[in-house]
Amino acid sequence: MPPQPHLDSDCRGVASILARVGDKWSVFVIMLLGDGPRRFNEIKRMVGGISQRMLTLTLRGLERDGLVTRTVFPTIPPRVDYELTDLGRGLWQPVEALGKWASDHQAEIEDARARFDRRNEPADLPTNRVAR
């Protein structure tokens, strides 16, 4: 079967989805929620370095895309749980595999970066200063 041409609108649609699910914070949140529902502060503690605002934006985006549900329990104080939807659970396995791959190859990537940086750092230029 010959390859089908890509429509610009299809590429833009896929790009917007990949921008959401490929975002580093989304990847961490999806990986965590794969183990079951979690509360906001629990997610924040487990995802090191994420601000409250960024976690809020990430969860809202995932909820908007139908990947996460937000359940408010009528308790005092209110309890809010986040969990993956069926659609989100379908994404969990590839995201988990991506996270595992990154973890397994972290040292190799860091070595490659260091080699690249050494090859591409500007050479020290001699200074033409006159000693006084």
Placement of each model-derived feature along the sequence:
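C-terminal regulatory/oligomerization modules of transcriptional regulators
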Residues: 1-9, 64, 69, 86-132
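Beta-hairpin "wing" of winged helix-turn-helix
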Residues: 63-83
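N-terminal helix-turn-helix DNA-binding core of bacterial DNA-binding proteins
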Residues: 3, 7-54, 81, 89
